[in-house]
Structure formats: C-alpha cells, structure tokens
From Swiss-Prot:
S-adenosyl-L-methionine binds at T162, G183, D205, N248. This is Ribosomal protein L11 methyltransferase. It comes from Alkaliphilus metalliredigens (strain QYMF). Methylates ribosomal protein L11. It is an enzyme of class 2 (transferase).
Amino acid sequence: MKWIEVSIKTTSEAVEAVANILYDGGVAGVSIEDENDFSLLEQSNEAWDYVDEALLDRELEGALVKGYLPEAADLAYKLELIRQSVALLPKYGLNIGLGEVTTLEVNEEDWSHSWKKYYKPTHIGKNIVVKPTWEEYERKEGEMIIEMDPGMAFGTGTHETTMMCAQELEKIVGAKYTVFDIGCGSGILSIVAAKLGAEKVIAVDLDGTAIRVTQENVDANDVSDIVEVRHGNLMDVVTSRADVIVANIIADIIILLSKDVKNFLKKEGIFIASGIILDKVEVVKAQLIANNLEIVKVETMGEWAVIISKLKGGVDE
C-alpha cells in the first residue's frame, strides 16, 4: 500500500499542536525530531550512552514532525486542511517557525518501522529508564525499567513534558497512592506511577488508539493489576478522588480541566500539569488559582513548563 509522508518543519514550541493537526487530518502514526532533545542530552553525559551515533550526524534546526496519510481520493483535501491549520497556529500565540509542509510517497514498510532506529533507552528521571521493547538494556542497580512501544500513540517518554511529569511523580508518588493520568497517550506516566508504588492508577484518554496502546504497554510492564485504562474524559469515566492527578496535554486543555480537577482530588491532593509552553504559564497559573488550587512550584525544561499545584483547604470526603 502506498502512503504519503507529510513533513512539517516547525519549532519545539509548536510540536504538539502540529502533531495534533496531523492526527486530526487522519494520519496513521507521527514521528518527531526535535533539536531540543539533543540539547537536553548534551546536559547529561550519562544519556549519551543510549543514543544511536547516526543521530549525531543529522542536521536539524527547530523540529520536524512527520505523519502518514493513505493514498486516497480525498488526499488533496486533507493536505490542504493540514496546511491551512498549520498556517492558523500563530493566531493562537504559537511560533511555528518555517511552518513548511512537504510530501513524499513511501511504501508502508518504509515508515511503519523506520522511526524505531531513533528510539533508544533513555533516562527520564533519577532512576527511571524508558526502554523500547525491541532494545536490549542491562539494568543498573536501583533503576526502574519502563518497557515501551508507543506505536501510533504520542508518548515515547523523551519529550521534555513527559520527562518533567515523570520526575515529579518520582518525587511525590508513594505506597497506597491513587493516581489519575489524564490524556494518557502511550500510558508511560501511568506505568511510572504504578512502578513507583501507587496502589491504583486510572489512565484516561479520548483517543481509541491511545487506549489500545496504553493497555498493551501496561500489560508488557506487568502492572495491569494496578493500572485501569478507561476510554473517555475525566468527568464521564471517573467518579472517585486521587492523591495525584497528572495531565500532560496542552495549556488550553489544562485551563478547561482546572475547573473540574478540584472535584477529583483528595484532601491535599496534587495536580501535575504539563504540555504548557512558557508563554502560557502565567495564564494557566491564574486559572488554577481561580479554581481553588495553590501553586506549589513551576519547573521548566527547554520551552516547556510543568506546574505543580495542590487543593486549598482540602475537601469533604
């Protein structure tokens, strides 16, 4: 079967928005190459041990997001829709850089596995290592290994937002904790929480592919007795409360979620919110405060932030 590879040159800031546009346009799988990932690796000598040397020869400015569309009658319409949607992003405050959209015809076998050669075992926390299921890795003492095959779902663990969320979970989650993972993607944060000792984790996503991939990764990591995967949104599929809620999505959705998240947190419950570009931090903080949440701290990595907040004054349980 023939596929059309759609490549979009953009910025690290716009990566998630561009990826979402591709998914909305009907792509089957997304890959992301981001120069910020290399900058982060340069800050950690240890991480270089896990990078394919072929990557170091690749010249990349900004970010390159690729998606794949089947060659079909409505292809031209979908491509035009993608181009128009990318062009509109600056109106929402995003710097898209070149915003250049190009296409290339490829065979299915060319794209469905080629991205795997760039996905290597990576430290995403003090003791957390994400390892692709097809890679060999010798575990060091004290390390927690997360086996991942993200498939078509967003979330390999190497993005700044995922790393920051994982690092905060590593500091916070303990035995008997209940954790909700909102917009679970590939399930990586749910698995991290489970392996950190959480008693119960509920992973929620609106996307059917994300639900399937999360369940597969949960099973592969032997945490299906802890992690329950639910299809839908938080308000519709969850009725209980959590000690920690983590949401690695985008700023606008965090703002919407802030209105309801207090109804799902236990007394002194913690809300870990990421997927937030630096320009949106103050707006998100203001909304969290307006909805009875107290800002604990803000951490940044590259052009992204994670905001940690907690419920003011507790709740009646």
